[in-house]
Amino acid sequence: LMTDPTGFDEWHILPGQGIYYNPPMIHNGKKVKHEGYTTDLITDFSLEWLKKRDPSKPFLLMCQHKAPHREWSPALRHLGHNGDKPFAEPANLFDSYANRGLAVRDQDMSIEKTFTETDAKLKAPGSLTPEQKKQWDAYYEPRNKEFEKSQLSGSDLVRWRYQRYMHDYLGCIKAVDEGVGRVLDYLDEAGLAENTIVVYSSDQGFFLGEHGWFDKRWIFEESLRTPLVVRWPGVTQPGQVCNEIVSNVDFAETFLDAAGVEVPKEMQGASLVPILKGQTPADWRKSFYYHYYEYPVPHRVRPHEGVITDQFKLVRIYAPEEPYFELYDRKADPAEMKNFSNDPAYAETVKMMTAELAKLRTQLDVPAETPREAFGNRPLE
């Protein structure tokens, strides 16, 4: 956020993305330095507020974690959580990007090209206390020395980085899991669980080596899909699964609807309350629109837009080169390794999806030309 939160009675936020260890945070406008692991601190502040709130009033708590954002630094207690057992590699860790356009090849978010010494934990964070640094060094230093001694290159280096990445990323997730458990336990202990809606989600997905990548941004499945788990006693049924197309633009309308507040007409999502009740509206969306702008930094992911249905995904990559399309069949090719846009067997599908993209652009009032300032503050290349 470029501004302080508004409309909240109390808030703790990280400046920018924040740091993992001993972070400064902004509490109701005042910057305060804390000692501890950021995921634990965010959980602590959430529980403190729950315990001191006015119990006679309804509440909304947003417990939003930094983890597992880059650079994926685990809690020190979780270093070595997997016992150094290797993680399975995705089948397309060494994607050649055959049959696809320039954009997927000319990016800057690959484990091979973009992974830094900080990402790989070859350098310790500067915010650690001396005692924390000892714990950090006890785990990483012997392994880093072994890595430096081995002089890895090529695919062997990519594989080593992938294993380090997965250890650290999943180590971050362990602390998030623990924090979620603490909040749910408190709701049970305080007798609030039966009258509280809990929504677990994320702002985006993430590549864990698929296509050789880390990070997000792309319209591809690993980045596009997010978790969405809802507990609403008396409304959602345990084990209930929804396969409808939903989006994080639906969240605000859902919260307002559940609270009995009128939804502003300018909002572009839709309330999920009927779906959560098992009553999907007959006119629920069958497709949705995606648009990514930020270019060339970070990561050189070209501006692109697209439309997604239950089976197909049409992508239009439009800058800085001349626009071109790619079509993916999500059922025939779930890993999205083949572009079907020039396959005669998919000609009608391309036509249908192009029309759907145009319809959604009109419906959402997307400008005919993307404003230059949407791309960021660097010149297009």
What is each PLM-predicted segment?
Residues 6-7, 78:
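Short, structured coil segments at secondary-structure junctions
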Residues 1-5, 217-219, 281:
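Short glycine-biased active-site loop of nucleotidyltransferases that positions the nucleotide triphosphate
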Residues 44, 325, 338:
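Alpha-helical elements of the RecA-like P-loop NTPase motor core of helicases
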Residues 7-10, 71, 204-210, 237, ...:
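C-terminal cap/loop subdomain of S1 sulfatases and analogous C-terminal strand-loop tails that border
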Residues 14-36, 51-56, 62-246, 258-266, ...:
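Active-site-proximal cap/lid insertion segments
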Residues 38-52:
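A Trp-anchored, charged/polar loop motif used as the substrate-binding/catalytic surface
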Residues 353-357:
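Short amphipathic alpha-helical coiled-coil/interface segments
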